[in-house]
Each structure stands twice: as C-alpha cells, then as structure tokens.
C-alpha cells in the first residue's frame, strides 16, 4: 500500500466546475490508457478454452444471483436480456482492470499522472488480470453515462461528461449499444451491494427502470 497524491475523477466530475476543454483532455487520456494497456487479445490456450464459461459467470450467473430479489419479473427479464447480449459480444483480453469507474481513477494535475486504483484481480473463478474487452467499458458507462457516482452522492450528474463519453466511444469506433447495455446491467446488479442506504438503492432502481 502506498500514499498517492491527486484527486479522484469522481470528485472532479461532481464537485469541480472545470472547463470543457479539461474534460476533453481527461477523457482522451482515460480512453487512451484503456486502449493501450487493457486491450491486448488473450493468447493463452487454456484461457481461450475456458473463456466462454468464465464470461457466462461474470455477465449472466452473477446477474441472475444479484437480481433475484429486485425489480418486477418483466424488468428482470429485460435486464437479463442485456446480460445475454453483452456476454455474446465479449472477447478475452490479457489485462482487465475490473472496476474502472471514476472513483477508482486518481489524477494528479501537477504531474499529469493518472493512477487506476483497486483492480478486481479476478474474472469469474479465474484469479489474475485476465478478463474481457467489454467489462471496463461497461464500468465506465455505468458511471459516466448512467451517473453511478452521482447517484451514490445524491448530486446532479455531469451532463457534459455524459455527452463526451458517447462522443469518445464514436471517435474510437467502439460498440456503443453493447457498452451502454453493459453499463445499465452493472448499475442494476450493484444495487444489492448498497444495502446500507435504501434511498440510494431506490435512486439506482429508478435510473435503471427509466432506461430499460
């Protein structure tokens, strides 16, 4: 463990009145880091063989388990359709962060350094950096587009960041529909984890229901 100086991007997004040009730069850096360091195709034979099973565990089995006591039957079916769609679109990569939202990215404006914090370190039953190419994008979507950290803090979303996220997805020719579906799914499945605040859970449910 080490002490790192800087400001969480979630705090900058929610509480600082920064020029749009600063956000353009920050989002460019985040996208470029993701594409440069968390995008290598997996070449390990054993991981390639077991990938379908692992991705099913991450996207489908986990979703079914967490959604069991939430939403109406019709809503759960719609959310699970998101899970099946995303799981079918995934491909294995060598390195995945696994929890890539703005509260896990530290930015030091003096040194212009970005630090990605608290990586998952597991994909299904597989320990390590192995993962899929959609999960980190979906995590960013559940925050930048659907406002995860704004919902947690109960403050207004940053609309410019939301629009900019879509703009950057288009610029990099990334699968917007799949990423947004994955982001909404991850927002839905994190609701049980926020058992300490029923009002927060309700805000998350409303966001999911309004976007199904």
What are these regions (language model features)?
Residues 2-23, 60-67, 121-122, 146, ...:
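A glycine-centered beta->alpha junction motif in the catalytic cores
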Residues 9-58, 67-90, 171, 184-187:
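Conserved kinase catalytic-core helix
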Residues 82-131:
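Active-site acidic catalytic loop and adjacent metal/ATP-binding pocket
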Residues 122-169, 184-200:
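Active-site activation/catalytic loop segments of kinase-like enzymes and analogous catalytic loops
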Residues 209-212:
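Amphipathic, Lys/Arg-enriched alpha-helical patches that create a basic surface
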């Amino acid at each position: 463990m080490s002490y790192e100086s800087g400001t969480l991007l979630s705090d900058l997004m929610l509480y600082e009145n920064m020029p749009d040009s600063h956000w353009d730069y920050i989002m460019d850096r985040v996208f470029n880091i993701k594409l440069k360091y968390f995008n290598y195709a997996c070449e390990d034979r054993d991981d390639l063989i077991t990938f379908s099973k692992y991705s099913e565990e991450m996207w489908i089995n986990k979703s079914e388990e967490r959604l069991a006591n939430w939403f109406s039957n019709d809503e759960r079916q719609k959310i699970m359709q998101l899970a099946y769609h995303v799981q079918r679109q995934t491909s294995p990569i060598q390195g995945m962060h696994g929890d890539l939202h703005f509260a896990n990215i530290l930015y030091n404006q003096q040194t212009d350094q970005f630090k990605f914090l608290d990586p998952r370190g597991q994909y299904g039953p597989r320990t390590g950096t192995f993962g899929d190419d959609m999960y980190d994008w979906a995590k960013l979507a559940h925050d930048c587009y659907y406002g995860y950290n704004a919902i947690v803090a109960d403050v207004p979303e940053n609309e410019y960041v939301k629009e900019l996220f879509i703009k950057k997805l288009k610029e990099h020719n990334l699968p917007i529909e799949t990423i947004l579906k994955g982001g909404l799914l991850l927002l839905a499945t994190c609701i049980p984890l926020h058992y300490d605040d029923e009002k927060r859970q309700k805000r998350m449910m409303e966001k999911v229901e309004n976007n199904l």
